[in-house]
Amino acid sequence: MLYQSIKEEQVLVHTGAEEAIFTFMNAVLESNDHIIVHFPCYQSLFEVANAIGCEVTLWETHEENGWELDLDRLRQSIKRNTKAIIINCPHNPTGYLMSKTTQQQIIEIAREHQCIVFSDEVYRGLEQNPDETLPAACDLYEHAVSLGVMSKTFGLPGLRIGWIATHNQHIYASMATFKDYLTICNSA
């Protein structure tokens, strides 16, 4: 089961991850917003926000530290206008897998500062040890958006199917409205 608390009406299907990222950022972010992005990462996770005019802080990780996330750096990066924290786990391109404790701390920091968490989870389910699979962010936090696709975990890239899952009805409705101008029918 992908999600513990998400109902089908809380899942919005897209034509792959790229469309979901583009939709989220255009529907939810504004040009004066600030976002923090786990880096290195899939380029669209920061470049779409740059194109909108957002201020982007790259939350850099380094090989010599085992790609570990620095939570103090995250706290220091938050500004008055920080709207979202963008995370990716299991991580592309490093393979880093944060601990459940680190994931929970990120959620708590986001909650404290009323930030959205956009969690790129396209490699979720491919962990070598299934016991290390993290919960979906959308199951942990009411203002989290989890991104999934068929191409990675399920090995079905030709279908071009992606989705977001969220409890936040405002985010869902904003994305659904914006998506109406992109595609009206995904791969069938």
Predicted features, each with a name:
Residues 1-34:
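Phosphate-binding glycine-rich loop
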Residues 4, 33, 83, 114-116:
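The start of beta-strands in P-loop NTPase/AAA+ ATPase cores
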Residues 21, 45, 94-95, 172:
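Glycine/Thr-rich phosphate-binding loops of Rossmann-like dinucleotide-binding domains
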Residues 26-87, 100:
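PLP-dependent aminotransferase-like
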Residues 32, 77-79, 104, 177-188:
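Short, intrinsically disordered, charge-balanced linker/junction segments flanking boundaries
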Residues 50, 57, 68-81, 93-116, ...:
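Active-site pre-lysine segment of PLP-dependent enzymes
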Residues 142-188:
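Conserved core segment of the aminotransferase class I/II
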